[in-house]
Amino acid sequence: MPVLATSDHAIKRDPNMVAAGVRAVVKTQQALKRDPSLATRVGKALFPPAEAALIADVIARDLPYYDPTISEAAVDGLSRFAQASGLARRSVSYNQVVALEFRHLWTA
């Protein structure tokens, strides 16, 4: 799942900026699903040539997992993992992890 991490403060201060970020993640995933070779163009600007040549194949391999939604089950599983591995002392709720006011953008 993609993650766009921000703070409650940023959401309150500029919800439009946060919404734009969510829309950008969703649109990028949609574009890569249509044409994984787009990743090569971006990769050439960011990575050494050998790695840039591989990125489209990596993206194509991972396309089944390109889903912008974050389920309650996923949050619950991550929370349990964080507790079991000592990264967290207590569980967190879905509402604490996901900014509910932006969920509608996942499928827009």
For each predicted feature, which ranges?
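A bilobed periplasmic-binding-protein/Venus flytrap-type ligand-binding module shared by bacterial periplasmic
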Residues: 1-16
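Short, structured secondary-structure boundary patches
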Residues: 8-12, 73-75, 105-108
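Secondary-structure end/capping motifs
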Residues: 13-89
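Conserved C-terminal helix/tail region of periplasmic/extracytoplasmic solute-binding proteins
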Residues: 83-108
